[in-house]
């Protein structure tokens, strides 16, 4: 038996590296016409999202970026950042989703420390991004993410996200993953002493955590997930990959407020959302005019300090089921 074990080595017939981007290809094949993302007046099906991600990955290579390059995002919870969780690793590159609440000096430090090659920036953060790049040593190119809520001022010097996508094509062959221990994303701490610390996530960890979310929550097929948790926060606890794995629908929310959350929950029949205890507080403390009644169960996952008993009771009375998990992401 020992001899057999020694002879049984990895090969293409018995081993495939764990890779969460495979969830996208599978859901696009099995549920091509199911809604993948809804954001304001925009919506995409899974086959749309798959093609957009392939075009994004293709454009990265056609524009001269290489395997292993760090691609940064300073963005809200919009479709573009969701797509990046697939496009960037599909191109063999590493995603750096930054905390948009940081000042320009801290962002400049992250740009230099991670050796960032390209930065996608939401229009709301364009000024702070320009300041950060101007004092950084790496000086990455900026590509803007246009949003109908932010207008189009002072953007003539920059290419847009959609124009960048137009450079790519849907025939792009995803870069083969050789080792599941390779890095899929780098995230930086905030709120710690000294400079931010970079934390690497490997493909294996992202894949297993994405599936772990399903087990922990006993998540049903085709979930409707509301993006109240920032995607820059540990890659949204890996839920960008989880929702594709369960063929769900992502409801993107640019800014979190009690009115916006209740409206989305009622309109789209949201049955899953995540957030810090402050999000729970917003839901239970909202005034009567902001609350919109809904008849279905909405599951909420929260971390950090355990919510007070009164908050948990109020959440339950309002139609929410709370799961508290342990978090140490800072």
What are these regions (language model features)?
Residues 75, 93-111, 123-128, 228, ...:
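ATP-dependent adenylate-forming carboxylate-activation enzymes
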Residues 245, 270-275, 284-330:
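Gly/Ser/Thr-rich phosphate-binding loop
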Residues 45-47, 184-208:
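Conserved AMP-binding A3 loop
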Residues 16, 25, 33-78, 82-86, ...:
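Conserved AMP-binding/adenylate-forming core of the ANL superfamily
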Residues 62-63, 90-163:
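Structural core segment of the AMP-binding/adenylate-forming
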Residues 32, 156-157, 166-188, 195, ...:
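Conserved pre-ATP/AMP-binding loop-to-beta segment of ANL
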Residues 57, 69-70, 76-104, 112-118, ...:
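A short helix-loop-beta submotif of the ANL/AMP-binding
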Residues 207-224, 232-272, 286:
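Conserved AMP-binding/adenylation subdomain of ANL enzymes
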């Amino acid at each position: 038996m020992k001899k057999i074990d020694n002879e049984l080595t990895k090969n293409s017939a018995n081993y495939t590296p764990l890779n969460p981007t495979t969830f996208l290809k599978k859901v696009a094949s099995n549920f091509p016409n199911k809604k993948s993302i809804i954001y304001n007046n925009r919506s995409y099906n899974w086959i749309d999202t798959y093609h957009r991600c392939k075009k994004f990955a293709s454009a990265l290579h056609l524009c001269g970026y290489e395997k292993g390059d760090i691609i940064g995002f300073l963005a809200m919870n919009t479709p573009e950042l969701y797509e990046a969780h697939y496009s960037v690793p599909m191109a063999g590159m590493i995603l750096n989703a930054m905390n948009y609440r940081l000042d320009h000096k801290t962002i400049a430090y992250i740009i230099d420390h991670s050796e960032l090659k390209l930065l996608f920036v939401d229009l709301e953060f364009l000024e702070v991004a320009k300041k950060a790049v101007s004092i950084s040593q790496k000086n990455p190119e900026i590509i803007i993410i246009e949003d109908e809520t932010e207008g189009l001022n002072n953007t003539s010097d920059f290419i847009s996200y959609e124009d960048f996508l137009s450079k790519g094509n849907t025939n792009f062959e995803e870069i083969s993953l050789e080792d599941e221990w390779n890095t899929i994303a780098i995230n930086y701490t905030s709120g710690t002493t000294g400079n931010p610390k970079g934390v690497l996530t490997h493909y294996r960890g992202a894949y297993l955590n994405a599936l772990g979310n399903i087990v922990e929550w006993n998540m049903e097929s085709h979930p409707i997930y509301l993006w109240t948790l920032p995607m820059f926060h540990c890659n949204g606890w890996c839920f960008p990959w989880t929702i594709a794995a369960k063929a769900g629908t992502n409801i993107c929310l640019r800014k979190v407020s009690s009115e916006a959350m209740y409206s989305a929950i009622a309109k789209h029949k949201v049955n899953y959302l995540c957030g810090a205890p402050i999000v729970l507080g917003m839901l239970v403390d909202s005034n009567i005019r902001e609350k919109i009644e809904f008849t279905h169960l909405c599951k909420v996952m929260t971390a950090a300090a355990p919510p007070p008993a009164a908050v948990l009771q109020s959440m339950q009375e309002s139609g929410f089921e709370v799961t508290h998990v342990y978090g140490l992401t800072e």
